[in-house]
Amino acid sequence: MEYKNTLLMPKTEFPMRGNLPKREPAIQEKWAEMNIYEKVQERTKGRPLFVLHDGPPYANGDIHMGHALNKVLKDFIVRYKSMTGYCAPYVPGWDTHGLPIEQALTNKGVKRKEMPVAEFRKLCAEYAYEQVNRQREQFKRLGVRADWDHPYITLEPAYEAQQIKVFGEMAKKGYIYKGQKPVYWSPTSESALAEAEIEYKDKKSASIYVAFEVKDGKDVLEGDEKFIIWTTTPWTLPANLGISVHPKLEYSIVKVNDEKYIIASDLFDTVAKTLEWENPEVVRTVKGSELEYTVAKHPFYDRDSLVMLGEHVTTDAGTGCVHTAPGHGEDDFIVGQKYGLEVLCPVDDKGVLTSEAPGFEGLFYDKANKPITEKLEEVGALLKLTFITHSYPHDWRTKKPIIFRATAQWFASIEAFRSELLQAVKETKWVPAWGETRLHNMVRDRGDWCISRQRAWGVPIPVFYAENNDPIITDETINHVANLFREHGSNVWFEREAKDLLPEGFTHPSSPNGEFRKETDIMDVWFDSGSSHQAVLEERDDLQRPADLYLEGSDQYRGWFNSSLSTAVAVTGKAPYKGVLSHGFVLDGEGRKMSKSIGNIVVPKKIMDQLGGDILRLWVSSVDYQSDVRISDDILKQVAEVYRKIRNTFRFLLGNLADFNPAQDAVAKAELREVDRYMLVKLNDLITKVKEAYETYDFAAVYHAIHNFCTIDLSSFYLDFAKDILYIEAANHHDRRAIQTVLYDVLVALTKLVTPILPHTADEVWPYIPGVTEESVQLTDMPEAIELQDGEALKTKWDAFMTLRSDVLKALEVARNEKVIGKSLTASITLFPTAEMKEMLESIQEDLKQLFIVSEYKLGGTIEEAPADAQKYEHTAVLVTQANGETCERCWVVSETVGNDNEYKTLCERCATVVKENYVK
């Protein structure tokens, strides 16, 4: 007889190899066929809503690792919530207006300036939809479950109509105004930028010290002094109209040779050193406040430079006398307004100096630095020229430096509702907690929001102008434009004349002749996405405002979190979200930013093609996403190894349940052996720990708990010793069915617990599980802990056993290394435990040699009585020797009963009985 045919070895068709790149697309097809998203929504209908509102990625190009991290994190949460008593709809969105799309078309050879704006915009829309479709397929490939057939897209007419309503509501409350103000201006984009559209990079700039002669000392100065200013933007000097000093600072009049200079006393040493003064002498000092309204001369134009007081003046750098050009800086503008200065801005949209800068007209601002510096030298006003490298704002899209430039722009007044914004920040739950401080400080310090852009591809600012240039924004015009956009899309604004965009028969006292013109600027794209709480949450029946959660990268504190908060508080008085969760950026394995120049870009597509979506998802669960995270081939290799262990665990569980029918074969919990119930205690611990981790969005804790459970609790302990029972005993042996009962509970629970993270694998496992009826594991709820009367006592006792067992395993390892034994089944062990451990061992009814996976087990005396050759540990001494007897050909246990049965000479008594009773006809 072939004894191997009498062993109940694992049997399953569940494949050992994942082969995820091929298998996942087939699983996703099945999801599509069964309408998994709709089925989940149907099953959870009527439950409390949990709304995670998707911040819209920009529709341009393939998805990158940041997108993958973001969408997968969202998917974890939504999937978990739908399995724990919530209805959790997930509506994906796309941001589809703005400069990158215009640039993409220009790069493809589209001549924007040579066609009607409406025509160009149609091409932009087509391109945006192509990008949406491209990204949608890539997000689906990640296994993200969403309402992919009904996303929100910011260029869609219904969305644009709601955005117009948000604008109208803000205007009605007096929060929208037009003003001449310095804004971030990108000469390369020829448009104003919001704070969220700039990034800081190092730039080399001229650093100059310039003397301004005093023209009128107002009895405070004698008139022969010179103010010294410092600037890194010489090109702004043609726009200089004043000098700012701090009212509370002390200023020194310093004599150097025959000249007298005015600088802040605190900066005397620094300036003297920089300007290489020899024997400077402080003649006297004056308070900054005394210098107010004194007048200096512009160094190369025949005009005055007024001395003003400004709280923005610091002693961090420079001279304490600040060059002030109201057309080129926010602080300058504020001070200039206070003193009634004009807003002079001699730079055009392209960054070229105009005729208001005589002598430098036609020069690009950066190229004007040299001739202006030369002019200063020529007139004797240049005291020092050096070059410095400093952090300077750049256009985040064109990567080129930007300037501050005063232009007529539309603004949302943040000042008007700043206190409500700060209150809303306070009422929101922030994860990580520092998010609150970050957004609070941004809101506290930010200026008014410049919402106009001088571009073609965006939502028009719905303003009309009367014959006297008065802007017209009324409920009637706003509602009419919103309805037009809802019906025709915003392109109608560029296709029709102003009169055809106004309500029929519309009149206005400022237009007696009935003539009107329309605004040509469009809205900042942050106003687009920032209106989604109104256009999506409020509008869709399956969603609600405020959302439970916004989850984006940490760059969105100044972006979407901020713009959404601003529009929502302006319109509703409340934040659009109850909670905000942010994640870090994805870096390479060495912690460097990914860039084409370094060649270290990791793309999601490549990972999914080579390893599979579930490996990428498992990586997302493994990282501390609230900080910046790392990815590399080596890191992915480690994750793939963890995946292999999880998959092998599923395969082992399925294989050993091939002949198990839960309805007929399950053993009642009360009839399970202690060790089996202990395994259920460990399973309960896992269920509790994993669910708590999901609740707190701590996915790394989920990852580690599941990995440890599979490798330590199952593979290294329970499954290891269970093989001797599962394979060797008769099919219906009580102990075997008891173990199968536990394995079944473990399998079902584990499959559900991994579903949010490994949905493909979980749904691949699910149909193999005996007795399941649901079409997909996604249509089930998270497991509940199994009720056990003696759970706590079991845990205490068996945790102690596990501690002692680890000592035994160490002793066996030592004996193996010393060639006392081969495999552990060739060993006999005698334990000499502490009194406490002895009592515990004596109370165990299970076969201890099975639990230790040895052939013979004896309990000796106390730890003090152990022989010299025993291995001594904290809780026991262990004597390891060769087991007596022969090796059984069927179970490989060494036993003195081998040969006792005359028919089965090579089997131990246990195996001979099993074979006779079950396999002999």
UniProtKB/Swiss-Prot annotation:
- Give this protein's Gene Ontology molecular function annotations: aminoacyl-tRNA deacylase activity; ATP binding; isoleucine-tRNA ligase activity; tRNA binding; zinc ion binding
Which residues make up the binding site for ATP?
K596
Give the primary localization class: cytoplasm
- Give the domain of life: Bacteria
Keyword rRNA processing assigned: no
Give the co-factor note: Binds 1 zinc ion per subunit.
Give the binding site residues for Zn(2+).
C888, C891, C908, C911
Q: What is its EC number?
A: 6.1.1.5
**Cofactor(s) for this protein?**
Zn(2+)
Which cysteines link up through disulfide bonds? Answer: none
Q: Where in the cell is it found?
A: Cytoplasm
Which SUPFAM superfamilies does UniProt cross-reference here? Anticodon-binding domain of a subclass of class I aminoacyl-tRNA synthetases (SSF47323), Nucleotidylyl transferase (SSF52374), ValRS/IleRS/LeuRS editing domain (SSF50677)
Positions contributing to L-isoleucyl-5'-AMP binding:
E552
**Any one Gene Ontology biological process term?**
isoleucyl-tRNA aminoacylation
Q: Name one Pfam family in it.
A: zf-FPG_IleRS
UniProt GO cellular component terms:
cytosol
The yes or no answer to whether the keyword DNA repair is present is no
Motif 'HIGH' region positions after renumbering to this chain: 57-67
Q: What is known of its domains?
A: IleRS has two distinct active sites: one for aminoacylation and one for editing. The misactivated valine is translocated from the active site to the editing site, which sterically excludes the correctly activated isoleucine. The single editing site contains two valyl binding pockets, one specific for each substrate (Val-AMP or Val-tRNA(Ile)).
State the oligomer form and interacting partners. Monomer.
State what protein this is by name. Isoleucine--tRNA ligase
